[in-house]
From Swiss-Prot:
Pfam family, one: vATP-synt_E
Gene3D superfamilies (alphabetical): ATP synthase, E subunit, C-terminal, F1F0 ATP synthase subunit B, membrane domain
Key word Ion transport present: yes
Function recorded in the entry: Component of the A-type ATP synthase that produces ATP from ADP in the presence of a proton gradient across the membrane.
Keyword Iron carried by entry: no
Protein's UniProt name: A-type ATP synthase subunit E
UniProt gene name: atpE
Family from the record: Belongs to the V-ATPase E subunit family.
Complex and partners: Has multiple subunits with at least A(3), B(3), C, D, E, F, H, I and proteolipid K(x).
Chief localisation class: membrane
Domain of life: Archaea
Gene Ontology CC: plasma membrane; proton-transporting two-sector ATPase complex, catalytic domain
Keywords for the protein's UniProt record, in alphabetical order: ATP synthesis, Cell membrane, Hydrogen ion transport, Ion transport, Membrane, Transport
Amino acid sequence: MPPDPRLEAAVDKILDRTGEEILSGLGESRKEAAEALAGSAKTLEREYDRIVEEGRKEADKIHRKIVGSADLEARNKQILLLETAIDRVLEKVLASISAERGPGYPDMIKSLIGEATATLGTTQVVVRAGSRDKDVVQASLGGFPGAELAQEPIECLGGVKVSSKDGSMTLDNTIDARFDRMKPLIRKEIVSKFGIGI
């Protein structure tokens, strides 16, 4: 069935209208994510320091081996080991984040839904959440007329996935997706602390 030109025009109009809002929302989301992470900073800071120390030891070991070897193949293997160590660090950080369900978590869920509805340009949405978050999400939907909670839970550490009711647009605002979007920046920061170029 050929695409409906009216639907395409409507989607284009929505995308044009909300372009700046999306960019602004992304900036706000980044700020909110930073604030949410700062809220659990003490716990995460201790874990972060321990993980960074483990990573530093692993990176120092890798760095000494790279400096001692002129063989490019050996260096590439060492970089692969560093990537593995970084992946372990990221997994531990993600596990720490997923375990957090502090008093600010319901506000974060409401903010994620608000960001998604603003980005999609409608509150007529279907919100999907993990089984752990269904009650929190359901309680947050009162502020979004026309929004409804999907019955089937999704596999995620937290957050929400929001779709327009017709399914044409979706915003993945799960902790998993947000973390995946931040991984390259986190990876770059960790690598730069050890002075190893990848």
